[in-house]
From Swiss-Prot:
Primary location: host cell
Residues in the signal sequence: 1-16
Protein name: Protein OPG192
Subcellular location: Host endoplasmic reticulum
Length: 182
């Protein structure tokens, strides 16, 4: 039976600069990941039966489920300063179906000089979670999403704020932003 939707909200304190060397801080980078194939999870746990694993270790969160139909509808990435969205990114949908195998979606958010993040469950929404890291990114931010089947990488997306490219699985640039040129 196919399961519903889960949303991850990644929020991280950051510092960006324009090409004219005037530093413009943005205090939140929120990444919302809409995934089809997982439902009814707690903040963080490991199931010995491998029905569902939600691990968080070293800035990485992984979702593992057996016999799954898993993919993502979209990834919305917002750069926020003083509660105002100053830039937006979107990675389009990807649905990869592999029944009878272990499917894993691994997301990774990297930043220099940040503290250890934590997972938070939103009140009133059992399917929405966040990872928050406090600190400032002086050397850029990188966000990765990987879709893996039986240890075979099926698809990988990378967002860098700094050089600021979004790559598809073939390494081609979908979008280029020169605004945050470190």
């Amino acid at each position: 039976m196919y399961k519903k939707l889960i949303t991850f909200l990644f929020v991280i304190g950051a510092l960006a600069s324009y090409s004219n060397n005037e530093y413009t801080p943005f205090n939140k980078l929120s990444v919302k990941l809409y995934i089809d194939g997982v439902d009814n999870i707690e903040n963080s746990y490991t199931d010995d039966n491998n029905e569902l694993v939600l691990n968080f270790k070293e800035y990485t969160i992984s979702i593992i489920t057996e016999s799954c139909d898993v993919g993502f509808d979209s990834i919305d990435i917002d750069v926020i300063n003083d509660y105002k969205i100053i830039d937006m990114y979107t990675i389009d949908s990807s649905t990869i179906q592999r029944r009878g195998h272990t499917c894993r979606i691994s997301t990774k958010l990297s930043c220099h000089y940040d503290k250890y993040p934590y997972i938070h469950k939103y009140d009133g929404d059992e399917r929405q979670y966040s990872i928050t890291a406090e600190g400032k990114c002086y050397k850029g931010i990188k966000y990765e999403i990987s879709m893996i089947n039986d240890d075979t990488l099926l698809r990988k997306h990378t967002l860098k704020i700094g050089s600021t490219y979004i790559f598809d699985r073939h390494g081609h640039s979908n979008t280029y932003y020169s605004k945050y040129d470190f």
